[in-house]
């Protein structure tokens, strides 16, 4: 997940909750960006952009008639308007909406306007995502942008790809997708936790800590990121004195916090979503809150909403990492033209890039047949003349020139698995007002240069 500073939120992960559309809502398809910008934010997703409870039965049945060509590119949204990751929804919807707006202003794709089908993903505790996917596949979506939560994506990826349609996530970070049997139809603009785990682990040890306690929610995102962070910490000379995987729906976290305190850590890494606030309150009550023991977070919980309702100063000094590219003031202004209420920009760039890359791949394929478009997606990001906008890149494509799209999230250089091989991360610091201090944000690049 990438972010645009001023309003940093967590990414590929969770945040606070809200509910602007009901699970059964079926808004009509719209052309352009209008439909996407007003999703309200809500609690983090207990299913993380990379996690999800996958214990319930998953419907893998293909939707009859999906995956066909009708001569126009149709984009379905599968982004969080409700659920534990709803805070990530607004910037992601805005990114999709802005991309479609600019693509259509440049003449559209295959000579026709791109159509958007709005849709809520909910979180992994509901069936909202399956309902949305069924509706969008039946409506002719060529690509479904989402989900933000890895756990949610794991519940619908088979249905989408079995239907011959592309799934393109702007925020999934679970390592599971790298080797998932997706028929070559799954892609993401957010980097795998293989990269973020190394970044956050190195930040903790780089700050001089050697006895680290890890608290992580139970789900693909939490456990995967915890494992990668542990490898980085121990590989850098530090020691993980405790690694506890907790239930994100627990009524109390006093027990796991007590176990953590008993190990006398000199720092704590908290990997979670909106439940992170309750964990922090337990840490404070136990005498090992951020003012006593340095606390670190990740894209699932580090945001400007994490401190809502907490006493001033509670989060002062808390640091965290998130996929993040420094968004220009111009791009932020464009996003706000789509959604004037935006507070954070996490994954807005990744969402914008997912749509733009798909549109360019469609132009190169000369058809909106998803299986044909998918074959062009990775190449769009790495093989040719660098270009940075749909309009500029499309002119090169129509002139017969190979392109290498460099997006808002950077030069992603997608590999054969559909994963970014290079990513920019922001190291964020929260100040005494419990908000992210933009001036203290630093950037780290991980992966291929």
Locations of the language-model features?
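Extracytosolic ligand-binding ectodomains
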Residues: 1-449
């Amino acid at each position: 997940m990438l972010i645009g500073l001023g309003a940093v939120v967590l990414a590929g992960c969770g945040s606070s909750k809200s509910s602007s559309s009901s699970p059964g809502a079926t808004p009509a398809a719209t052309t352009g960006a209008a439909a996407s910008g007003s999703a309200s934010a809500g609690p983090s997703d207990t299913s993380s952009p990379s996690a999800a409870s996958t214990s319930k039965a998953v419907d893998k049945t293909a939707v009859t008639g999906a995956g066909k060509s009708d001569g126009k590119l149709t984009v379905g949204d599968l982004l969080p308007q409700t659920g534990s990751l709803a805070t990530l929804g607004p910037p992601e919807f805005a990114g999709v909406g802005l991309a479609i707006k600019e693509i259509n202003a440049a003449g559209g794709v295959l000579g026709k306007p791109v159509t958007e089908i709005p849709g809520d993903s909910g979180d992994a505790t509901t069936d909202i995502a399956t309902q949305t996917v069924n509706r969008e596949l039946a409506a002719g979506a060529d690509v479904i942008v989402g989900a933000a939560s890895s756990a949610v994506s794991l519940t619908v990826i088979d249905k989408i790809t079995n239907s011959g349609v592309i799934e393109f996530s702007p925020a999934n970070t679970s390592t599971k997708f790298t080797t998932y049997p997706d028929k070559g139809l799954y892609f993401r603009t957010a980097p795998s936790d293989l990269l973020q785990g190394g970044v956050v682990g190195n930040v903790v040890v780089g700050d001089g800590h050697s006895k680290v306690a890890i608290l992580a929610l139970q789900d693909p995102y939490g456990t995967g990121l915890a494992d990668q962070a542990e490898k980085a910490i121990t590989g850098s000379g530090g020691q993980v004195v405790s690694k506890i995987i907790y239930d994100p729906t627990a009524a109390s976290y006093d027990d796991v916090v007590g176990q953590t305190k008993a190990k006398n850590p000199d720092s704590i890494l908290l990997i979670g979503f909106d439940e992170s606030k309750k964990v922090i309150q337990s840490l404070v009550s136990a005498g090992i809150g951020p003012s006593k023991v340095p606390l670190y977070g990740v894209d699932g919980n580090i945001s400007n909403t994490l401190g809502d309702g907490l006493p001033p100063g509670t989060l002062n000094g808390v640091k965290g990492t998130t996929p993040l590219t420094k968004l220009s003031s111009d791009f932020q202004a464009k996003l706000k033209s789509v959604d004037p209420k935006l507070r954070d920009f996490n994954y807005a760039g990744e969402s914008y890039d997912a749509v733009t890359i798909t549109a360019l791949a469609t132009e190169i394929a000369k058809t909106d047949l998803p299986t044909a478009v998918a074959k062009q997606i990775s190449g769009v990001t790495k093989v040719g003349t660098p270009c940075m906008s749909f309009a500029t890149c499309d002119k090169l494509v129509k002139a017969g020139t190979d392109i290498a799209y460099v997006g808002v999230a950077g030069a992603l250089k997608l590999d054969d698995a559909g994963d970014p091989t290079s990513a920019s991360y922001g190291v964020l610091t929260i100040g005494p007002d419990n908000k992210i201090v933009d001036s203290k944000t630093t950037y780290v690049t991980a992966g291929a240069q």
